[in-house]
Regions:
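Type-3 copper protein
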Residues: 1-269, 295, 384-429
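Short, flexible loop/turn elements at secondary-structure junctions
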Residues: 254, 272-274, 296-298, 312, ...
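Short, glycine/acidic-rich hinge or "gate" loops at secondary-structure transitions
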Residues: 259-263, 267, 324-329, 368-379
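Catalytic zinc-binding patch centered on the HExxH motif and its immediate surroundings
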Residues: 268-288
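Post-HEXXH active-site segment of zinc metalloproteases
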Residues: 284-287, 297-306, 314-346
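Short, well-ordered loop/turn and helix-capping segments at boundaries between secondary-structure elements
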Residues: 313, 317, 321, 360-367
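Post-HExxH zinc-binding segment in Zn-dependent metallohydrolases
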Residues: 331-374
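Domain-exit/linker segments immediately C-terminal to small folded modules
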Residues: 352-357, 367-403
Length: 429
């Protein structure tokens, strides 16, 4: 599946960081096209290396693939939600990179959980048994079930889909789609002994994903190897309150931005507190757009800023699937104001884009009548410095020969929006 070329007006709207439904739709299409390409690549690799797979791994993969295809016929939109869930992307990247042998077979086994999640979401009846070699059945976007026996039994009934460890250690009943809570409900989906369900943050459909093993690639990501926090270290009440307040703050100063954040993000992944030293508050994985990896900020306004920042990392990662913005093999590195280490041009572009969105937000916060007073003071103190740093980064980008024609057009659009916030890009001598 190849997404349609991006219209010039959509590229221009994205460059300005301002929310637009048409832009969001184009980016979602790009994410799905990329996900389908990776899934097809996994199928092709598995088919070509059939003779190198063990008989159990090959059989289980074929069964899981058949279940996924059947679920797609029942509910294509619901299956798409599972395939486009951020951790599915992290898994696909890990599976395609795994060396042939036991490591690859372990990655292939995860397709069973993806297929079961798709069937549950689509309301497709699922029966039979599945092998779970890791001892943990992971249903992306839904939850996890421990399976010490290494096998699960599946069955349908009036209450929904029943999943049980073959040794009787754990079970879950996941309700049919019509029986699930709607958007904005914070209670978890499903019930049962040993079942741990993902929880939905208040006021929307974004999950607080503190369970999925693929929510960060091992051994972590980013400077200092940022680690995902496990559920015992993720206080649900604090996250829910801070999330609700952050959304209220965003809505008061920039309602469109609040809506966009809820539409682009699919999950928030809590990060563990660092052992020592300062580390970034958030991150976005290129393989998992739509997931904001965030260490719980001290205030709701800081969380609101992190959400806007990570939303724009997702937007740019998805846009780059539609139209490459930087050429290959660039070796030059540059200093930017928000990082202590030199960055290559693609990273400068990512940082400049996310910080331009943050500059736009602070511009509205400091002048908005509905802004929280403490947040208005913070925005006023930091706006000028960040505006200057973004301007310098835009100048570096425009002087670089590593941008593609579309990338140059995009950065010029960023510069125009930056100028509208009160300053033009600085000339670098």
């Amino acid at each position: 599946m190849t997404p349609a070329p991006i219209p010039t007006e959509v590229l221009g709207a994205l460059a300005g960081t301002r929310p637009a439904p048409r832009s969001t739709q184009a980016l979602r299409a790009a994410i799905h096209a990329r996900r389908m390409l990776l899934l097809k690549s996994l199928l092709v690799r598995t088919d070509r290396q059939r003779g190198l797979l063990g008989p159990v791994a090959r059989r289980d993969f074929e069964r899981a693939w058949a279940l996924l295809a059947a679920a797609e016929r029942t509910g294509p939109a619901e299956v798409r939600e599972v395939l486009d869930y951020p951790t599915t992307g992290t898994w696909l990247a890990a599976a395609l990179a795994a060396p042939q042998g036991a490591a690859f077979e372990r990655q292939l086994a995860h397709l069973a959980g993806v297929a079961v999640a798709a069937a549950v979401r689509a309301g497709h009846t699922v029966t039979g048994t599945l092998t779970v070699p890791t001892g943990l059945l992971v249903l992306p976007g839904l939850g996890v079930l421990p399976c010490p026996s290494g096998r699960v039994r599946l069955g349908g009934g009036p209450g929904g889909t029943r999943i049980a460890d073959d040794g009787g250690h754990a079970e879950a009943v996941l309700p049919h789609p019509a029986a699930r809570p709607g958007p904005g409900a914070s209670r978890a989906t499903g019930d049962g002994t040993g079942w741990s369900a993902l929880r939905t943050l208040p006021g929307g459909t974004v999950r607080l994903d503190d369970l999925d093993p693929y929510r960060t690639p091992p051994p972590g990501t980013g400077p200092g190897s940022l680690r995902a926090a496990d559920r015992p270290d993720c206080p649900w009440g604090t996250w829910a309150r801070r999330w609700r307040r952050a959304r209220e703050l965003l809505t008061a100063v920039d309602g469109r931005r609040a809506v966009e954040t809820g539409a682009v993000l699919r999950a928030v992944v809590p990060l563990a507190a660092p052992d020592t030293g300062a580390t970034p508050m958030g991150a976005t994985l290129r393989s998992a757009p739509g997931a904001a990896l965030i260490r719980l900020p001290g205030t709701a306004s800081e969380l609101a800023e992190s959400l806007v920042h990570e939303t724009h990392h997702t937007k740019l990662a998805a846009l780059d699937e539609l139209v490459p913005l930087c050429g290959p093999d660039g070796s030059a590195v540059h200093r930017v104001g928000w990082r202590p280490d030199p960055r290559p041009v693609p990273a400068v572009l990512q940082g400049a884009y996310a910080h331009l969105a943050l500059t736009d937000l602070w511009w509205r916060v400091r002048s908005g009548a509905g802004a929280d007073p403490a947040w208005r003071r913070r925005a006023g103190e930091r706006f000028e410095a960040l505006r200057e740093e973004v301007g310098q980064a835009l100048s570096l980008l425009l002087e670089s020969d590593e941008l593609t024609p579309a990338g140059r057009e995009f950065v010029q659009g960023m510069e125009r929006h930056h100028a509208g916030l009160g300053v033009t890009a600085q000339n670098v001598l």
